[in-house]
C-alpha cells in the first residue's frame, strides 16, 4: 500500500498493496517542489523499495500518491486522461486548479470504493506555482502541504521550519529534511526520496539515495 495518513473507505484488505507514505509539496516564487519517499508495502512485507509516488498529470502538473497503490494510480491515470483531452479542446495546457478539480471530483465520486489521497501541484501561466490538497472531496490551496502516514511525525517540524519566500534550493532542502525525518520515525515510509521541481522552464527530477539522506540526532 501507499498507506495514507487519513485513509478513506474500508480498512485495507489482507495483502493489498499500499504506499505507507510521506508526501510533500511546497510553493516558491515561480514554481513548486514535490517530494516523496519510495516504500511500498503489502501487509508487513515491503514489496517495492524504490517506487516513484510522484505521478505526472500533464506537462507541468504532478500529483503525489498515498493510500492504496492501485487506487491512487487509477485516479492519477483517469485524471491524466481527462486533462489530455481538456488540453486538446482548449488548445493550451490546463491550469493547475483545473487538474486539482479533476482529481477532487474523481476522488469524491468514488469515495466509498477508493482508499487514496492525491496531492496536486504544478505551474501554469496564470497563477505560477500552486499546491492543492484534495482529501475527502475538499479543495484547498496551501503554501505547502504534507500527507501520508509519515506526515503525523513532522507537523511540528514543518510548521517551525517553513519560511515564506524560500528559494527553489531552500524548498528542496526543506522537503528533503522533512521527508527524511518522517522516514526515520514511520515504519511505513522509507527507501529513497524522489524530488520534482516544476517551473516555467520545465521539470527537474532528482533522487536522494539512502546514503545521501540527512542524518539526525537520534541516528
Curated annotation (Swiss-Prot):
Outcome following mutation: residue 165 to D: In PRAAS3; digenic inheritance; patient also carries a mutation in PSMB4; patients' cells show reduction of proteasome content and cysteine-type endopeptidase activity of the proteasome
Q: What residues form the catalytic site here?
A: 21
Q: Which SUPFAM superfamilies match?
A: N-terminal nucleophile aminohydrolases (Ntn hydrolases) (SSF56235)
Site residues (Cleavage), renumbered to this chain: 20-21
Keywords for this protein: Acetylation, Cytoplasm, Disease variant, Host-virus interaction, Hydrolase, Immunity, Nucleus, Protease, Proteasome, Threonine protease, Zymogen
Coarse class of the protein's main subcellular location: cytoplasm
Pfam families per record? Proteasome
Would you say which domain of life the source belongs to? Answer: Eukaryota
CDD domains per the UniProt record, alphabetical: proteasome_beta_type_6
> EC number(s)?
3.4.25.1
A GO molecular-function term, please? endopeptidase activity
Supply the residue numbers of the propeptide(s) excised during maturation: 1-20
Residues recorded with modification N6-acetyllysine: 53, 109
Q: What induces it?
A: Up-regulated by interferon gamma (at protein level). Up-regulated by IRF1. Up-regulated by tumor necrosis factor-alpha (at protein level). Up-regulated by tetrodotoxin (TTX) in glial cells. Up-regulated in Crohn's bowel disease (CD). Up-regulated by heat shock treatment. Up-regulated by CD40L via the NFKB1 pathway in cancer cells.
Q: Which GO terms describe its biological process?
A: immune system process; proteasome-mediated ubiquitin-dependent protein catabolic process
The subcellular location is: Cytoplasm; Nucleus
Keyword Ribonucleoprotein listed? The answer is no
Listed under catalytic activity are: Cleavage of peptide bonds with very broad specificity
Q: What does this protein do?
A: The proteasome is a multicatalytic proteinase complex which is characterized by its ability to cleave peptides with Arg, Phe, Tyr, Leu, and Glu adjacent to the leaving group at neutral or slightly basic pH. The proteasome has an ATP-dependent proteolytic activity. This subunit is involved in antigen processing to generate class I binding peptides. Replacement of PSMB6 by PSMB9 increases the capacity of the immunoproteasome to cleave model peptides after hydrophobic and basic residues.
Q: Which disease is it linked to?
A: Proteasome-associated autoinflammatory syndrome 3: An autoinflammatory disorder characterized by onset in early infancy and recurrent fever, nodular dermatitis, myositis, panniculitis-induced lipodystrophy, lymphadenopathy, and immune dysregulation. Variable accompanying features may include joint contractures, hepatosplenomegaly, anemia, thrombocytopenia, recurrent infections, autoantibodies, and hypergammaglobulinemia. Some patients may have intracranial calcifications. PRAAS3 inheritance is autosomal recessive or digenic. Proteasome-associated autoinflammatory syndrome 6: An autosomal dominant, autoinflammatory disorder characterized by recurrent fever, skin rash, myositis, liver dysfunction, splenomegaly, pulmonary hypertension, and basal ganglia calcifications. Disease onset is in early infancy.
Entry similarity comment: Belongs to the peptidase T1B family.
Q: Tell me, how does this one assemble?
A: The 26S proteasome consists of a 20S proteasome core and two 19S regulatory subunits. The 20S proteasome core is composed of 28 subunits that are arranged in four stacked rings, resulting in a barrel-shaped structure. The two end rings are each formed by seven alpha subunits, and the two central rings are each formed by seven beta subunits. The catalytic chamber with the active sites is on the inside of the barrel. Component of the immunoproteasome, where it displaces the equivalent housekeeping subunit PSMB6.
- Name of the molecule in the record: Proteasome subunit beta type-9
Gene name in the database record: PSMB9
